[in-house]
């Protein structure tokens, strides 16, 4: 088989396939990029893991335009391509190579959240349920029929990293369950294979398609004139990089809890005593209402207050509760701002 993937999300599937004894004839990943604090050229997590496993790696800048790479991949004669968050659309010349097809593990319940950031958008939109789907790939963006999926509930206090870890494990599991079915159906006429595999066309699943567009830096700005829930969703969905400003420095906000009585059962037990101490919307948005040394900063919003439990001030390390308050030298009545220049 040929494996396609780039971020750490895809590594558990690569590991699972390798550990299960499948012959992986090649791994395709994005080229090395500058990343990290040192802004150094670094291999993608998938490329690094593949090299550690002694697998052959290909890193096309744009597979659609690189006929020589396509020819080299074809020469490997892979029976199937497994794709997890590769990051490029595959052309028909690639999709048609393996006799058992190209199959993608997508981190949403299709047709909801087609595209590059389904995990982030499920959190930003306040979805209570998401999941993973194994989909037969077509030239369109995540439009193919679905072979298998698994639904999961999203917790109120679950951030993008935590949800990603859960879904990446499910992706690996679903591929291990699905590949034997795909192999048993064998190559042949697509319509007959689909019938045998009982794949479901997305238009038959129900629901209008939604698209997870690429996120920009502006999407990461916290506007305290929004509701506490909207701010909380932005913090969780864009973890760890949603940000506000503090004394002309960028303040990343990395863990929050909306102090809403209706959410009491979903809040941390230590946070619940804070409920009801402030009238919703009676204070200027962004104003610090309390510095709770063991919990963090209580900040006013358009609606109920929002508790900031973890943050990272520009030039500092991540900090919780009292340490965060000390780093900011925060006092009641001060204001967090909106970053205008990014």
UniProtKB/Swiss-Prot annotation:
Annotated function: Attaches a formyl group to the free amino group of methionyl-tRNA(fMet). The formyl group appears to play a dual role in the initiator identity of N-formylmethionyl-tRNA by promoting its recognition by IF2 and preventing the misappropriation of this tRNA by the elongation apparatus.
What's the protein here called? Methionyl-tRNA formyltransferase
Task: List, alphabetically, the GO terms of the cellular component aspect.
Answer: cytosol
Which NCBIfam families does the UniProt entry name for this protein? fmt (TIGR00460)
Indicate whether Transferase appears among the record's keywords.
yes
**Which molecular-function annotations from GO does this UniProt entry contain?**
methionyl-tRNA formyltransferase activity
Enzyme class, one word?
Answer: transferase
The EC designation for this entry is: 2.1.2.9
The transmembrane residues are none
Keyword Transport set for record: no
Q: PANTHER family from the xrefs?
A: METHIONYL-TRNA FORMYLTRANSFERASE, METHIONYL-TRNA FORMYLTRANSFERASE, MITOCHONDRIAL
Specify the domain of life of the species encoding this protein: Bacteria
What SUPFAM superfamilies does the database record attribute to this sequence? FMT C-terminal domain-like (SSF50486), Formyltransferase (SSF53328)
Q: Which organism is it from?
A: Prochlorococcus marinus (strain MIT 9303)
* CDD domains membership: FMT_core_Met-tRNA-FMT_N (cd08646), Met_tRNA_FMT_C (cd08704)
Binding of (6S)-5,6,7,8-tetrahydrofolate occurs at 108-111
Q: Which UniProt keywords apply?
A: Protein biosynthesis, Transferase
Q: What reaction(s) does this enzyme catalyze?
A: L-methionyl-tRNA(fMet) + (6R)-10-formyltetrahydrofolate = N-formyl-L-methionyl-tRNA(fMet) + (6S)-5,6,7,8-tetrahydrofolate + H(+)
Which is an annotated Pfam family here? Formyl_trans_C
- Quote the HAMAP family the UniProt record gives: Formyl_trans (MF_00182)
* Family indicated by similarity: Belongs to the Fmt family.
Q: Which InterPro entries match?
A: Fmt (IPR005794), Formyl_trans_C (IPR005793), Formyl_transf_N (IPR002376), Formyl_transf_N_sf (IPR036477), Formyl_transferase-like_C_sf (IPR011034), Met-tRNA-FMT_C (IPR044135), Met-tRNA-FMT_N (IPR041711)
């Amino acid at each position: 088989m040929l494996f396609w993937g780039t971020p750490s999300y895809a590594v558990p599937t690569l590991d699972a396939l390798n550990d299960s004894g499948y012959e992986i004839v090649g791994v395709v990943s994005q080229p090395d990029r500058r990343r990290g604090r040192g802004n150094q050229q670094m291999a993608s997590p998938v490329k690094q893991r593949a090299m550690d496993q002694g697998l052959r790696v290909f890193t096309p800048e744009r597979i659609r335009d690189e006929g020589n790479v396509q020819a080299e991949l074809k020469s490997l004669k892979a029976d199937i391509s497994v794709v997890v968050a590769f990051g490029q659309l595959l052309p028909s010349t690639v999709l048609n190579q393996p006799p058992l097809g190209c199959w993608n593990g997508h981190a949403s319940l299709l047709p909801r959240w087609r595209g590059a950031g389904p995990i982030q958008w499920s959190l930003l939109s306040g979805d209570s349920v998401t999941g993973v789907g194994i989909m037969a790939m077509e030239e369109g963006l995540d439009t193919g029929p679905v072979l298998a999926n698994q639904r999961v509930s999203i917790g109120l206090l679950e951030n993008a990293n935590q949800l990603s870890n859960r879904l990446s494990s499910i992706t690996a599991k679903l591929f291990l369950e699905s590949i034997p079915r795909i192999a048993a159906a064998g190559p042949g006429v697509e319509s007959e294979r689909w019938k045998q595999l009982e794949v479901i066309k997305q238009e038959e699943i129900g629901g209008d398609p939604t698209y997870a567009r690429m996120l920009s830096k502006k999407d990461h700005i916290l506007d305290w004139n929004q509701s506490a829930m909207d701010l909380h969703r932005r913090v969780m969905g864009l973890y760890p990089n949603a940000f506000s400003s503090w004394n002309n420095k960028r303040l990343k906000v990395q863990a929050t809890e909306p102090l809403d009585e209706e959410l009491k059962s979903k809040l941390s037990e230590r946070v619940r005593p804070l409920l009801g101490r402030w009238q919703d919307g009676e204070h200027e948005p962004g104003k610090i209402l309390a510095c709770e040394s063991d919990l963090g900063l209580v900040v006013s919003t358009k609606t109920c207050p929002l508790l900031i439990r973890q943050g990272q001030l520009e030039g500092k390390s991540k900090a919780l509760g009292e340490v965060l308050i000390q780093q900011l030298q925060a006092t009641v009545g001060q204001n967090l701002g909106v970053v205008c220049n990014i």
